[in-house]
Amino acid sequence: LGEEPGFEGVRPAIGLNYGSTKLGIIGTDERLEAVAISESTNLAQFLQKMAPKYSARILVTGTLLEQIPDARSRYHLRWIGFVSLSATEALEPIYDCFDGDTPEERAWKAETKEQFERGVALYCARSYYEARKMFIEVLKSSYQDFAAKEYLFLCDRRLNQEDTGAQGYLVRY
């Protein structure tokens, strides 16, 4: 999609996570509905909504990647940081799986992957000035990288305010 005739501009997004889920049927005699309830499905749904903001079509959790043998060598992945899970206060690593992107997107993500991930690591370590420099370099090669733009914005915001304590994550869920 997005490249097929009649689907220009359509950019589907997918969020993938791993965990237990409870399935059931709810409703009344007049109307029944199937429901999936779990933190896993809620996080996957959150990632799906988050994907376009970061130039991603497929966002996956580190928890899912741990379940797939050789995932890091089988797929084109770019670490985009952590999501802070408010229910547990844990940090979940999030990856952009760019195998589903256009050839042009795959090329610039592969080309800037090392610099981008270094910038993310610096941001997580609260080295905002150094992280900012990395994201500027990424944007010189790929100005359309929304994730790098978002991190640049976050670095600027952090540099222009007093340190508010440990952040180390991209977004809170």
Residue ranges and their predicted role:
Residues 1-39, 63, 69, 88-93:
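Catalytic core of nucleotidyl cyclases, primarily class III adenylyl/guanylyl cyclases
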Residues 21, 52-125, 130, 136-137, ...:
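Cytosolic regulatory/linker segments at or just downstream of nucleotide-handling modules
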Residues 43-44:
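Structural preference for long, well-ordered alpha-helical segments in enzyme cores
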